[in-house]
Amino acid sequence: MSMRLVVVLLPLGIALGWAVYNIGKLAIEQWRRTGSKV
């Protein structure tokens, strides 16, 4: 594996994981809110 590939993929993977984490957190919050209302 080339160093350049690692340098490109690492921040990309971190950004992707952070986005997925935030979207999941928001989805759970929204689901809890609608669940408690109903």
UniProtKB/Swiss-Prot annotation:
Membrane topology of the entry: Single-pass membrane protein
Protein's UniProt keywords contain Electron transport: no
One GO biological process term: photosynthesis
Membrane-spanning residues: 5-23
Keyword Thylakoid attributed: yes
Subcellular location: Plastid, Cyanelle thylakoid membrane
GO molecular function: manganese ion binding
Highest taxon of the lineage: Eukaryota
Ranges in the topological domain labelled Stromal: 24-38
This protein's GO CC annotations: cyanelle thylakoid membrane; photosystem II
UniProtKB keywords: Cyanelle, Membrane, Photosynthesis, Photosystem II, Plastid, Thylakoid, Transmembrane, Transmembrane helix
Spans within the Lumenal topological domain: 1-4
Stated family: Belongs to the PsbY family.
Annotated HAMAP family: PSII_PsbY
Function: Loosely associated component of the core of photosystem II (PSII), it is not always seen in crystals. PSII is a light-driven water plastoquinone oxidoreductase, using light energy to abstract electrons from H(2)O, generating a proton gradient subsequently used for ATP formation.
Quaternary structure (record): PSII is composed of 1 copy each of membrane proteins PsbA, PsbB, PsbC, PsbD, PsbE, PsbF, PsbH, PsbI, PsbJ, PsbK, PsbL, PsbM, PsbT, PsbX, PsbY, PsbZ, Psb30/Ycf12, at least 3 peripheral proteins of the oxygen-evolving complex and a large number of cofactors. It forms dimeric complexes.
Protein name: Photosystem II reaction center protein Y
Organism name: Cyanophora paradoxa
